[in-house]
């Protein structure tokens, strides 16, 4: 299989007060959006719940997830960021090119 030319790490902080079904739904939607952008999820890791340095959307804790994704073209960051901003259970995200 051909190796991906473009690799990114997407770090997502989910609302810790959301129910587990809602979190699973959000994670599934993130993966579906990644696949819709012609990328594949190479790795998905639950980093657990962590105390935040400062409050974000009135939350003092967050559930951290890290997705390593790869594709053969640059990610459409505007479209992906718009999706992440509209997802109600995501309180913060970071997209890094690796």
Task: Please report, for each region that a protein language model flagged, where it lies by residue.
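Long, contiguous binding/interaction regions
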Residues: 1-62, 70-98
């Amino acid at each position: 299989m051909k190796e991906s030319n473009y690799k990114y790490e997407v770090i997502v902080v989910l609302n810790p007060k959301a129910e587990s079904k809602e979190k699973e739904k959000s994670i599934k939607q993130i993966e579906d959006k990644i696949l819709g952008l012609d990328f594949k999820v190479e790795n998905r890791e639950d980093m657990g719940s962590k105390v935040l340095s400062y409050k974000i959307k009135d939350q003092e804790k967050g559930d951290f997830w890290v997705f390593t994704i790869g594709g053969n073209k640059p990610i459409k960051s505007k479209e992906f960021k718009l999706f992440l901003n509209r997802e109600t259970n995501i309180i913060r995200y970071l997209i890094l090119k690796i």
